[in-house]
Every structure is written in C-alpha cells, then in structure tokens.
C-alpha cells in the first residue's frame, strides 16, 4: 500500500531541480505507474522546469496514463509558444494518446502551427482520434508493447511491403507510422534494419519516432545507425535525444561508448539524454528489479 506521504515524497523529488536528473526521471516514472489525480498534479507542477528533456517526458507520461484529468495542463503546454518545440510536440501527442474527442478541434487548429514538429504531431493526433471514432475505440488485440502509440499498427504483415510503406515519403505520415509500428511489433533483425533506414528520411518528427521504436525493440542490429545519428551535430536535437535513449535501452558495449562520447555534448537536451540513457544502461545491465524505483528508494534510502 502506498501512502499519501510516499506519493508526496516522490513528487518532491520530481519537482526539485537540485536532484540529479536520473533521480527525477525515476520519480516521474514511479508517479506514472501510481496514476491518479495526485500523481497528475505533481507531474503537472514540473512544467515550469528549465529542462526541455524533463518537460517532454512529463507530457509523454501524462499521455501514456490516458487520464482525462491531464487534458487541461496538456492543452496549456501545447498552446504555450514559450515552451520548446519538443515539449509542445509531446503535449500534442499526449492529447492524441488520451483519445478524448473533445480535443479534436483544438488539435485541428494546431495542425497548421508554424513549428513543423508541432503541426505534424497534431495532424497525427487528429488522424488517431478519427481512427478511434471509426473503429469504436482501441483495438482489443494488444501488441507485444504496452505503449499507447500515435498510430495503430498496419494490418500488413509482409516486411518488404511494410518497409516500402515506411520509407515512401509521398505517403501520408499516419500511414507510414502505421507501417513503423507494424515493423516494431514484428520484431527481429530484418524489421530493425528496415526501421533504421528511416533515420535517413526527411521529417525530423518521423526520425525521432524511429529512434523511439528502435529503443523499444532493443535489437542490437540498429546500434550503428543510432550511434551515427547521435554523433551527427547537425541532426535535430529531438532525434539525437531519442537515439541516445534507444542506445541506453539496447545496452550493448558499443552503446556505452557512444553515450559516453556525448555526455558533455554542447546541446543540452543531448547531454541530458545521454545522462539518463547511461542510467538506463546501468538498469538494463544490472540487477535492479525495476527502473521506476522511486518508492523503493524512499523505503531503502541507503540503496
């Protein structure tokens, strides 16, 4: 049983800028797992932080929780042009993940936002909400991953056809995302390599999602492409960030070398992502039971 005092202590860790970023991330994911209005309130309070990486992750977690009570704060973040593009983008995606049609018109409004990552995200969220309306809600068949995705996986099963759809930049972004998630769900080396080819496509939003799904797959075949994207200083920081976190999740020795090489990167979101990814690497290669260990750390402060 989790006490209110414990939830508050985890929340205090999240909102305390004096805490190491890794500890704040673990607190965030602990709150996400706990759920409920108190957890949402603590997560919402951290949107005035100066770390774009942390704020982006706050929005991501609120979307994954799929709790309507998070809609007002996510709308505020989407509307706030002082927030970094990657934060506003994640708020738009989170609104799509929650799946409530009440936000459809607002998402349509921001589908023409001057920030292209925000506009494309809201276009995808609109398509997702429309798809949910047409198909009577979420699919009853769950894939191998627990995440709430910006698009449902395509029904096509042929990897060659899916690769072709993924890389065809003339197709609607929503359809390419559907191919992306179908390849992820298929798993294996061929699917991972097909996805890794997407890191060369034109849309930064698309490339960043490729990095995300490769991190979910944790297939080492994609390590060279992820490391190359991370090492490219002209690549969009949002893409480099996802590639860093993917390398942390894959957790092979080559990943460790790539992350250490960029832990002092001049781009803040990249170096912070490498810090968090190194913490994830430690978790993946260690004996810790779970990453979201905020409660365990409270109960065993010496560990």
Curated annotation (Swiss-Prot):
Modified residues (N-acetylmethionine): 1
Assigned EC number: 1.14.99.29
HEAT-like PBS-type repeat windows: 23-49, 54-80, 87-113, 175-201, 206-232, 239-265
Cofactor(s) annotated in UniProt: Fe(2+)
Keyword Oxidoreductase among record annotations: yes
Pathway: Protein modification; eIF5A hypusination
Residues that bind Fe cation 1: 56, 241-242
InterPro entries documented for this protein: ARM-like (IPR011989), ARM-type_fold (IPR016024), Deoxyhypusine_hydroxylase (IPR027517), HEAT_type_2 (IPR021133), PBS_lyase_HEAT (IPR004155)
SMART domains: EZ_HEAT (SM00567)
Key words of the record: Acetylation, Hypusine biosynthesis, Iron, Metal-binding, Monooxygenase, Oxidoreductase, Repeat
Annotated catalysed reactions: [eIF5A protein]-deoxyhypusine + AH2 + O2 = [eIF5A protein]-hypusine + A + H2O
Residues the entry annotates as binding Fe cation 2: 89-90, 208
Keyword Metal-binding: yes
GO molecular function, one term: iron ion binding
Cofactor binding note: Binds 2 Fe(2+) ions per subunit.
Similarity remark: Belongs to the deoxyhypusine hydroxylase family.
Protein function: Catalyzes the hydroxylation of the N(6)-(4-aminobutyl)-L-lysine intermediate produced by deoxyhypusine synthase/DHPS on a critical lysine of the eukaryotic translation initiation factor 5A/eIF-5A. This is the second step of the post-translational modification of that lysine into an unusual amino acid residue named hypusine. Hypusination is unique to mature eIF-5A factor and is essential for its function.
Family annotation (HAMAP family): Deoxyhypusine_hydroxylase
Identification of the protein by name: Deoxyhypusine hydroxylase
Record organism: Bos taurus
